[in-house]
From Swiss-Prot:
InterPro entries noted in UniProt: CinA, CinA-like_C, CinA_C, CinA_KH, Competence-induced_CinA, MoaB/Mog-like_dom_sf, MoaB/Mog_dom
Name this protein carries in UniProt: Putative competence-damage inducible protein
Gene from which the chain derives: cinA
NCBIfam families from the UniProt entry: cinA_nterm (TIGR00200), molyb_syn (TIGR00177), PncC_domain (TIGR00199), PRK00549.1 (NF001813)
Family per similarity comment: Belongs to the CinA family.
Recorded superkingdom: Bacteria
Pfam families the UniProt entry points to: CinA (PF02464), CinA_KH (PF18146), MoCF_biosynth (PF00994)
Length: 409
């Protein structure tokens, strides 16, 4: 089967939004043996979209579109696809009720514009969207298949995984199962180097690394004629990867780093408090994402100024004067100070130069220290990163969580 991915949206052409959808879909299709022959990006224009569909179906069996399913007048993907397949748009009552219910969650009422999102080609399979107001759909006609998906990745990806992949698996006459391993502490290129033998010799299962800020995921995907056989194919490859990467793997599936840490803290009844400077509360914010953390997370303090470090955390004035706020000595005193003043087993701190100003030759932008206090023992980690302010702050949080995880083992 040959496929084209067609991403719709003037905002993509203008560069206002990065097109991550095509990359995601291409990787998923490759895992099930569907060849992607072409990527296209076009603006919100019906005539252009019709021409692109005509061109794509000249050599492809399958076209997947993203975007253009919103409530505004320039969202024209659905109308264009219906016209291409010579289908009338009809109101789908179930979708209308689901859209109305979702709008009520945000204290919004149904409008005529939103009602437009409940119209679909008469002969199609509708794909529910629990994460937004734009359902997708699949239409088959004259040996042509079009899969129409919403543009926002947080809506498109769950729909693709839960609805589209099972549909495509039936077309390819095999069962596909995947397992995701979550890795932090080493980058994607390091992961690829360490498991290069596996990546170079892979056939079935396939192993695909994906990178995001501070983390790498490995998706192991196996194909077989039954679910049991597919899962059994994954087991030896996963075992081999775990032996190589060891504790750089922090979890699997949908598990987050903060969830892993929270489970350790709750299970061992270890209380924690945070003292943050350069991350400004982001670290505490990550930890409290876990719903059961309230029993062990006692306090989060943002101590940005030297005065607050002295008054709130009992950091010594002499330490600040001798080493400056961005130093391992201050990071350690911050961690110990928050733990002792809060009465917790663990204190963790961040201090650094996030930029864009404030850097010096000795203390450049991207220099960060993470301090850790665990039941009387102290640990410190130095980081050096390049990037903008938000990147440095976010990567510091990920590294701080990983530093804590490794020292809790």
């Amino acid at each position: 089967m040959k496929a084209e991915i067609l991403c719709v949206g003037t905002e993509l052409l203008l560069g206002d939004i990065v097109n991550t959808n095509a990359q995601y879909i291409s990787k998923e299709l490759a895992n099930i043996g569907i060849e992607v022959y072409h990527h296209s990006v076009i603006g919100d224009n019906e005539n252009r979209l019709l021409k692109e569909l005509e061109r794509a179906f000249n050599y492809c069996d399958l076209v997947i579109t993203t975007g253009g399913l919103g409530p505004t007048k320039d969202d024209l993907t659905k109308e264009s696809v219906a016209k291409f397949f010579q289908e009338d748009l009809v109101l789908h009552e179930k979708s209308l009720k689901q859209i109305e219910k979702r709008l009520l969650c945000f204290n919004k009422s149904m409008t005529e514009s939103n009602k437009k999102q409940a119209y679909f080609p008469k002969n199609c399979e509708i794909l529910e969207n629990p994460n937004g107001t734009a359902p997708g759909f699949i239409i088959e006609k004259d040996n042509k298949i079009a899969i129409i998906l919403p543009g926002p990745p947080y809506e498109m990806q769950p729909m693709f995984e839960k609805k589209v992949m099972p549909y495509l698996e039936k077309l390819t006459n095999c069962t596909i199962k995947s397992k995701v391993l979550r890795i932090t502490g080493i980058g994607e290129s390091d992961v690829a180097d360490l498991i290069s033998d596996i990546l170079e010799s892979q056939t079935n299962p396939t192993v695909a690394p994906y990178a995001k800020q501070g983390e790498t995921t490995l998706r192991i995907t196996a194909k077989a004629n039954s679910e049991e056989k597919a899962l059994n194919l994954i087991v030896p490859i996963e075992k081999k990867i775990r032996q190589i990467l060891e504790d750089n793997i922090y979890g699997s599936g949908e598990t987050s780093l903060e969830e892993v840490i929270a489970n350790i803290l709750v299970k061992r009844n270890l209380t924690i408090a945070t003292a943050e400077s350069c991350t400004g509360g982001l670290l505490a914010g990550k930890l409290i994402n876990f719903p059961g953390i309230s029993s062990v997370f006692l306090e989060g303090a943002i101590t940005y100024s030297n005065e607050s470090k002295i008054n709130r955390l009992n950091v010594k004035k002499e330490t600040l004067e001798k080493y400056t706020a961005v130093s391992k000595e201050v990071a350690l005193e911050m961690a110990e100070g928050i733990a002792k003043s809060s009465g917790t087993n663990i204190g963790i701190s961040t201090t650094g130069v996030a930029g864009p100003g404030g850097g010096t030759y000795d203390k450049p932008i991207g220099l960060v220290y993470i301090g850790l206090y665990i039941n009387g023992k102290t640990f410190v980690k130095e980081l050096n990163y390049s990037g903008n302010r938000q990147f440095i702050r976010n990567i510091t949080v990920t590294r701080a969580l990983d530093f804590l995880r490794r020292n809790l083992k």
